[in-house]
Amino acid sequence: MPLKDRISFLTSPAEVDGFLQANPTAVLFKAGSCHKTPETFVHVQAHLDPREDLKLGIIKVVESRPASNHVAELFGIEHESPQIIFFKDGKNVFDRDNWDITSDAMREGLKVVSA
């Protein structure tokens, strides 16, 4: 199944909770409105497309700030955008933000969720 068919757009705290309950091992991408978002999403797409076992939740932080803040509060991580967060068994196990979202970081995150 291609990545585009495994993406859920999350707009509320309840949707975030539902996504993570249904997909305890998954990835969240918090998308901002600056030029970094599309540039970093290239790495996300390239590394998640072949991983048919992983679903991707996307939070557009400008439109859905409560959902983004919920993730930060729930998992004790600072809100950033763009930001990639890997979950394994319902726990945040790896995250990167801004220009630290690279191919190397994606490989590292995938290694952590696959261990």
Residue positions per predicted region:
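Structural signal for short hydrophobic segments within the conserved structured cores
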Residues: S8, G57, V93-F94
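Residues at alpha-helix caps and immediate loop-helix transition turns in enzyme cores, especially N-
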Residues: E39-F41, A67, N98
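N-terminal leader/targeting and pre-domain segments
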Residues: M1-P24, S114-A115
